[in-house]
Design a protein with these regions (language model features):
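Elongated scaffold/linker segments in the mid-to-C-terminal portions of large proteins
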Residues: 55, 62, 86-89, 93-103, ...
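TPR/Sel1-like alpha-solenoid repeat signature
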Residues: 224-230
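Membrane-proximal, proline-rich intrinsically disordered regions
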Residues: 23-71, 252-253, 397, 412-414
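Short coil/turn connectors between adjacent alpha-helices in alpha-solenoid helical repeat scaffolds
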Residues: 103-108, 179-186, 236-243, 264-272
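Short coil/turn linking the two alpha-helices of tandem helical-hairpin repeats
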Residues: 154-155, 161, 230-242
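Conserved, well-structured interaction surfaces
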Residues: 43-64, 83-158, 175-220, 391-394, ...
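Bacterial Sec-dependent N-terminal signal peptides
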Residues: 1-32
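Short, surface-exposed recognition loops and adjoining beta-strand edges that mediate ligand/DNA contacts
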Residues: 65-82, 163-166, 203-222, 238-346
Length: 488
């Protein structure tokens, strides 16, 4: 789990650097007192500060506004975001090589360089206060971070170039820095190999019995979770014999003959990659450190909501910090509520259609060429009555103290599975905030449809808001954002 340790990375290193590089006039230092590169490794404190700096390039999934740092929601088929951010240019195809939104390749290679420097020097630390156990821990956490930086780039750019232990000189010219990309399979094998080494190291902890002071470190489960996701990505059609990528090759170069002119994507489909992905996932399914979250009262709605509501619960493998819930809450709370509310992040209609009925059958099985949904009549969903309103009891009433929770809403939202009601908020329903509830309308002129902050699809995301608190009074609660969880 990755808690507030990452939020301390820059703070600790910046504070230490500030103390170590304070004005000479103020400290009246002698020339030989200046911190040199060699002196960093003489002190436990400065060695740790360098470690924190190397770790500070980890992605920030639970900070800033939704869509500010990552494109994965706004540019997806499952989510729609109102605000004008980089994902919009991706959705409209208006970006190009000169204007790449969310460009982070230089950031991650700088992070890789810092990890390499740290790993090559950490064992030079001569401070008796630095134990072998601490040095081992820092080394392997940095090695995990280096692998994760590669993984993050692969998520964004596909195949990238592997540099191993090389220290790139970012002051060099573009020509000197040029490296051809390794193939996709080479990248996968390298990252999987690095993460496997981390998972097998005695210095990388297991989750069970982990002290709270260690929350934030990558565990063995974290390593296997990244491996599982990467192998899943590698098995899917996008990276497994995709015809669109068969002509993508490295430029011909004499400087790197082994990669000159080679195809960087797999040329043929390999069904065995699905077996490898399944095996990687089973490692975590067999790990008794993690269990699917259960509220303990038999309520499936609370079981599902608790995954993102109960901090540090048993289903979470790795999280992004224990942080204030404001960012996720304020972007998903309807503008019809008092206090700060932006209400612009929600699921698309296709995502809403993907949820099953409470009998387990899926109502929408596909779409006609015209875009009209294909309905499974045996599911109980009626296309003729989907927009008709009727009064029915809202199933996820466990969030509230109200014994009777009846709403008048379209039948298309009636009798759906628990995950639907925990995730999807639709107009004509009450938004619960503490002991209060507010009826929300997304219709034109409604309290949830302002001129600029409103859900374009007519839906908001329900589950990342703490419905037990009243955001109108500035109460947002805290969140351990699930980067990897057992349920996936």
């Amino acid at each position: 789990m990755k808690l507030q340790i990452k939020s301390l990375y820059l703070l600790c290193f910046a504070t230490g650097a500030m103390l170590l590089s304070s004005c000479e006039d103020f400290l009246d230092r002698q020339e030989d007192e200046k911190l040199t590169f060699e002196k960093i490794w003489e002190s436990r404190n400065t060695t740790k500060q360098y470690w924190l700096n190397a770790m500070s390039f980890l992605p920030n999934y639970n900070g800033g506004f939704i869509g500010d740092n990552e494109p994965y929601l706004g540019a997806s088929d499952e989510c729609t975001i109102t605000y004008d951010r980089g994902y919009r240019s991706m959705n409209f195809g208006s970006w190009n090589a000169s204007n790449v939104p969310y460009y982070k390749m230089d950031k991650y290679y700088k992070g890789i360089r810092e990890c390499n420097i740290f790993m090559q020097n950490v064992y030079k630390c001569s401070d008796p206060l630095a134990t072998q156990e601490q040095l081992d821990e820092w080394y392997w956490q940095a090695r995990f971070a280096r692998a994760y930086y590669y993984f993050s780039m692969m998520c964004d750019y596909g195949p990238i170039f592997l540099i191993g232990d090389e220290l790139l000189d970012f002051a060099a010219s573009t020509e000197e820095l040029y490296r051809p990309r390794n193939t996709w399979d080479e990248c996968v094998n390298y990252v999987v190999g690095e993460l496997t080494a981390c998972a097998e190291s005695n210095a990388v902890p297991v989750q069970k019995g982990l002290s709270t002071s260690k929350y934030g470190l990558a565990t063995k489960g974290t390593c296997y979770a990244v491996i599982s996701r990467l192998k899943l990505y590698s098995a899917r059609d996008l990276f497994n014999g995709n015809a669109l990528y068969r002509t993508v090759k490295n430029p011909v170069t004499d400087k790197f003959p082994e990669l000159s002119g080679v195809n960087i994507f797999p040329q043929t489909y390999d069904a065995n990659k699905w077996l490898e992905a399944a095996k990687a996932a089973k490692v975590l399914l067999d790990d008794t450190d993690y269990q699917l979250y259960r509220a303990g009262n038999g309520d499936p709605y609370e079981d599902y909501y608790g995954i993102t509501h109960v901090n540090w619960n048993s289903e979470l493998i790795w999280t992004d910090r224990y942080n204030n819930r404001f960012s996720w809450g304020v972007n998903t709370v309807p503008t019809g509520l008092p206090g700060t509310a932006y209400g612009g992040v929600g699921p698309t209609q296709q995502q809403v259609d993907a949820y099953a009925m409470n009998n387990g059958r899926y109502p929408i099985t596909g779409y006609e060429a015209s875009g009209d949904p294909i309905v499974d009549n045996a599911s109980g969903y009626s296309k003729e009555e989907e927009l008709q309103k009727s009064e029915w009891e809202y199933p996820a009433k466990g969030w509230s103290n109200y014994k009777n929770y009846n709403i008048t809403a379209p039948n298309m939202y009636k009798d759906r599975e628990p995950r639907f009601y925990i995730t999807v908020f639709f107009g004509g329903n009450y938004w619960l905030h503490g002991d209060a509830k507010t009826m929300i309308s997304f219709a034109k002129g409604g309290n949830g449809n302002k001129s600029h902050d409103y859900p374009k699809s007519g839906y908001l995301c329900n589950r990342f808001y703490d419905h037990t608190l009243n955001s109108g009074n500035g109460q947002w609660g805290n969140l351990t954002f699930p980067v990897f969880r057992l349920g996936e």
